[in-house]
């Protein structure tokens, strides 16, 4: 199992959650900038999470060949 892949997945989930919180606060306070920052953080988190999953699958595949 790839440690870097797992680490990237966790980092992505944290960033995505942070984005959801920011977006929610921005929505409630009608702060467009904060809301947009939250959306961007969610997007970055989703990407990191998916990259981590791919890294893990590749690593698992390489481990199975050994």
UniProtKB/Swiss-Prot annotation:
InterPro entries membership: CsbD (IPR008462), UPF0337_stress_rsp (IPR050423), YjbJ_sf (IPR036629)
Domain of life of the source: Bacteria
Residue numbers spanned by region Disordered: 1-22
Basic and acidic residues composition bias: residue spans: 13-22
A Pfam family of this chain: CsbD
PANTHER family according to UniProt: UPF0337 PROTEIN YJBJ (PTHR34977:SF1)
UniProt similarity note: Belongs to the UPF0337 (CsbD) family.
Name recorded for this polypeptide: UPF0337 protein BA_0987/GBAA_0987/BAS0923
UniProt organism field: Bacillus anthracis
